[in-house]
Swiss-Prot record:
Name of this chain's protein: Methylthioribose-1-phosphate isomerase
Family stated for the protein in its record: Belongs to the eIF-2B alpha/beta/delta subunits family. MtnA subfamily.
Residue numbers marked as site, Transition state stabilizer: C179
S-S pairs: none
Compartments it resides in: Cytoplasm; Nucleus
HAMAP family associated with the record: Salvage_MtnA (MF_01678)
One Pfam family matching this protein: IF-2B
GO biological process, one term: L-methionine salvage from methylthioadenosine
Active-site residues, record numbering mapped to chain: D267
Encoding gene, per UniProt annotation: MRI1
Amino acid sequence: MTLAAITYTRGSLSILNQLLLPHQTTYDPLHSACDAWHAIHEMRVRGAPAIAIVAALSLAVELDALAANNQLSPEPKEVEVFIREKLEYLVSSRPTAVNLAEAAGRLGGIVSAKAEVRGVDGREVAEAYIAAAQRMLEDDVKDNRAIGEFGARWVLENAVATGSESGSEKGKVAVLTHCNTGSLATAGYGTALGVIRSLHATGSLERAYCTETRPYNQGSRLTAYELVHDKIPATLITDNMAAALLARNRAGSAASVGVSAIIVGADRVAANGDTANKIGTYGLAVLAKYHGVKFLVAAPRTTIDMNTKTGADIVIEERPKQEVTRVRGPRAGEEVDGLRAMETITVAANGIDVWNPAFDVTPAALIDGIITEVGVVEKDASGAFHLARIFE
């Protein structure tokens, strides 16, 4: 059964509460843009593509309810203003993720164009919005599968396959990934994890490695959950083990499977290729460069922000200090009907200052390719990405 982070039918939206994973599977209903804002800000739903879709669909559900209760203005301009204000509010929930802002801008444009049509009423403006939001859900899964196929092909053609010394089959690859970029971060299949899924589906994956991804543990809680669910051969490591793992490539250890590529997702890609992603991504890119391992970013074109010139222009969200100083989970061994009581414990000294940026920026110079739904973008001979070409 395929994992679903988002369940939607017209007028009804629920999200898988990712704060409770992997211990509890609970779907939270969202009835309005306000509900979605809190779900996104609290990270019950996360991943740049997923939050954009949830935000868009939450407003679609709210509009449906207003129309059903005859509370929707008949005036097209009033409905347009209402929708635009709600979209602006939703964007404020996670400002670093460009997909949300891009979706809001695109949906707002659709609504404005509809409102200008002579003879339309407010309900028709709302219907135009709802139809566009629903298409986002459908398109994301299709785009993710394309990313997976393009990325898998590129890795097999350009990355060094794992060696015979490790006991692996010739032509297979091992991939390291960071954070969570799978079905739980998108409408389905995933971006970077989608590439891993595609490699596994063709029998080309030797092993996937996933980082714990402190401080929110998206790797150990979510990516590991997806890999186990899909029965993909995988190993969990802590963030500070990545260098040692890559060093085993050079050592030629008979006990190890060499890493062929590091593939990550993105929350925002600047026009020059600089990429904002989960904190720790930059460090992995530096390690990849030193160890001669290919470093790839997997993201749909909606994540590429051509209006942001470089990574220096990307606003980095800072999260609460408690995410670093506390850990939440069930007490080991205490289970009742498959559910466990969740507890929060403190793991740091009281009074210590905390710096907790949610993202870092990886310079384009450290990135070998950007995998999109229309192909893999590589740098030219001068070392520059030309991302505008994929929008032509």
